[in-house]
Amino acid sequence: MRSEESTMTAGRITVYGSCVARDVAGEMERRGWSVERYIARQSLISAGCPADVGDVDLSLLRSSFARRSFLSDMVGNLEAQLTAVASYTDLLLWDLTDERLGVLETSPGTFLTRSTEALTAGLYEGLPARFLELGTAEHLHLWRPALLRFHALLERLDLAKRTILINVPWATRTTSGMSTVPSWGQTAMEANWVMTRYIELVYQETDLRILQVPDELVVADDAHRWGAAPFHYAGSLYSWVADELEISLAPRSLAPAL
């Protein structure tokens, strides 16, 4: 049984994606919503495709969040995680930023999502794996059927109508008027050009709702708590997204309390 306190929130959120969706959820928490689960660093391609990583030293990952995310991605447990929270999720927030670094094919048909934490820790050094870069024909060829499987999963769990993809481009400028710095070799313009193809696939292949953030709000925050990056935005963006989500969901039928 879930506690009485948890059933009295404005609504319950599951996050699948990066800090982009999580920071929006953080804004909504301040408005009385609760975050039930945060599923991060797991590409649609690696979901359901457990990877063999051998004797990787997980102690190299400094945070429990990074270790937990790596292990979840390693076993590809997106379906299990969504199944566990589907009945009490009012809103599934999704963004594609964690797709940006591509995937590693550790053996034929098994994949691992590249993450900043694992790259920084040198976790992939010595790992026999093939890199599939975002935006390449091979990556897109794998991502499209993975998207269809994801959509079918959402339909099966009755989550499709409760899912919203946040489509926000990387910022090219900061709150101080400076140009944003590249992230792992990707500039904002490069990343935005590549990511457009993936957003278009969601439009074309599914009926999931997509929330497009206005360009004038796409400004990176020089003082963001996670540091400087083209996808760490000023607070006004998160407030706008939260406003739009609450408008679009009201009146809404919340998931039944357990």
Segments from the language model and where they lie:
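Well-ordered, non-membrane alpha-helical segments in soluble/globular domains
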Residues: 75-79, 136-152, 185-200, 235-236
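Acidic carboxylate-rich catalytic motifs and surrounding loops in phosphoryl-/glycosyl-chemistry enzymes
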Residues: 165-169, 207-224, 256-258
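A structural motif corresponding to the C-terminal end of an alpha-helix
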Residues: 85-88, 145-165, 197-211
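Substrate-gating cap/lid alpha-helix
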Residues: 173-212
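Surface-exposed cleft-lining segments at the edges of enzyme active sites
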Residues: 101, 120-148, 177-189
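Basic, amphipathic N-terminal segments that precede the first structured/catalytic domain
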Residues: 2-90, 223, 248-249, 256-258
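A basic- and aromatic-enriched beta-loop-alpha substructure that forms the phosphate/nucleotide-
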Residues: 57-132
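Histidine-centered active-site loop/cap adjacent to the catalytic His
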Residues: 225-258
